[in-house]
Amino acid sequence: MVEPQEGKTRFHDFKLSNELMHAIHDLGFPYCTPIQAQVLGYTLRGQDAIGRAQTGTGKTAAFLISIISQLQQTPPPKERYMGEPRALIIAPTRELVVQIAKDAAALTKYTGLNVMSFVGGMDFDKQLKALEARHCDILVATPGRLLDFNQRGEVHLDMVEVMVLDEADRMLDMGFIPQVRQIIRQTPPKSERQTLLFSATFTDDVMNLAKQWTTNPAIVEIEPENVASETVEQHVYAVAGSDKYKLLYNLVTQNKWERVMVFANRKDEVRRIEEKLVRDGINAAQLSGDVPQHKRIRTLESFREGRITVLVATDVAGRGIHIDGISHVINFTLPEDPDDYVHRIGRTGRAGTSGVSISFAGEDDSYQLPAIEALLGRKIKCEMPPDELLKPVPRKHH
């Protein structure tokens, strides 16, 4: 039993089913994060909602708990075919879909609800077999792959009771909206389904889509600043470009860090850093658009399980990664878009734990700092790294 605590909402307060509470308890979530407390207050009553929240705020569990409650309370239709999901979650990237499906599997553990996911770059026939084997309650998919199945007549969306659009701003940026429209047209009219839309930003374009697809939605905004700055201790080291690798190597080895993410701006840079780390005896792996999907998923699993210490990634590849216990984020190069800085450092300090970010500012990228500080609304102290962190990397005897 979770004790009441002032200023905090317990999951217990929402009258969720025993099966769902059991799973939430297994995951070790005693209290709701702010977005969970606010969103669930509306969505559990069946209301539509638009949430502005970045990753790391707990929004995935918010919409999943809402979906599971809804599906548990309404019996499935009598006439039901394979390939007719009752809840549909659309997300822009493969990583995000895999992550949401994993969270959904954990939360539905005791409910008997089936979760399926479709992503491009994975074996089509294997996904099809899974679909034909049992009823699908919750379907998580990227827009393109969902349309493939839909156009082949394998998936029908006429039974969708709840629809979630995650990272709507990102879907806009990636040009997925025409596909999303095609998908939504095949679901029941908005008056007959519950629709939840999440976005890191509320631009006019996002709000227009929300207006078209939702009915009298509750609008929930969780300020992004505290995601970045309150739980993450931020440092900047002024360091010459040629010394950045030495600094990275020494930070990881001298501190014996166990789970670190390193961000760089370009794929070739990511590859180079990873190759050097591996050569110097560190368990490292890379994630970028060049890495085939099956390998990306294996890499993420190894990182989650601690077999990989350092994961080097580009912004696009790193954006959908939600792995608890990342102690440090290193910006090997400062990002060109200040928003990416917030997303990067948000990989650590997740769900209320503290984390550390260290940015390397060199002659090529330190000019990005003022824009990042403007977005954060404060200065980040720039320090010179201590000498022991710039020691030459010992050459391994091959």
Curated annotation (Swiss-Prot):
Motif, DEAD box: chain positions: 166-169
Q: Which GO terms describe its biological process?
A: RNA catabolic process
Task: State its location(s).
Answer: Cytoplasm
SMART domains recorded? DEXDc, HELICc
Indicate which residues the UniProt annotation says bind ATP. 53-60
Under the heading InterPro entries, the entry gives:
DEAD/DEAH_box_helicase_dom, DEAD_box_RNA_helicase, Helicase_ATP-bd, Helicase_C-like, P-loop_NTPase, RNA-helicase_DEAD-box_CS, RNA_helicase_ATP-dep_RhlB, RNA_helicase_DEAD_Q_motif
Catalytic reactions on record: ATP + H2O = ADP + phosphate + H(+)
Q: Which residue ranges does UniProt annotate as crossing the membrane?
A: none
Top EC class of this enzyme: hydrolase
* GO MF assignments: ATP binding; ATP hydrolysis activity; RNA binding; RNA helicase activity
Q: What is its main location?
A: cytoplasm
Find motif (Q motif) and give its ranges.
Answer: 9-37
Q: Which CDD domains match?
A: DEADc, SF2_C_DEAD
Residues of the Helicase ATP-binding domain = 40-220
What cellular component GO annotations does this protein have?
cytosol
Q: What is its EC number?
A: 3.6.4.13
Q: List the disulfide bonds.
A: none
Boundaries of every Helicase C-terminal domain copy: 243-393
* Keyword field: ATP-binding, Cytoplasm, Helicase, Hydrolase, Nucleotide-binding, RNA-binding
Does the record's keyword annotation contain Nucleotidyltransferase? no
Pfam families in the record:
DEAD (PF00270), Helicase_C (PF00271)
Q: Describe the subunit structure.
A: Component of the RNA degradosome, which is a multiprotein complex involved in RNA processing and mRNA degradation.
Q: Which family does it belong to?
A: Belongs to the DEAD box helicase family. RhlB subfamily.
| Function as written in the Swiss-Prot or TrEMBL entry | DEAD-box RNA helicase involved in RNA degradation. Has RNA-dependent ATPase activity and unwinds double-stranded RNA.
**Can you say what this protein is called?**
ATP-dependent RNA helicase RhlB
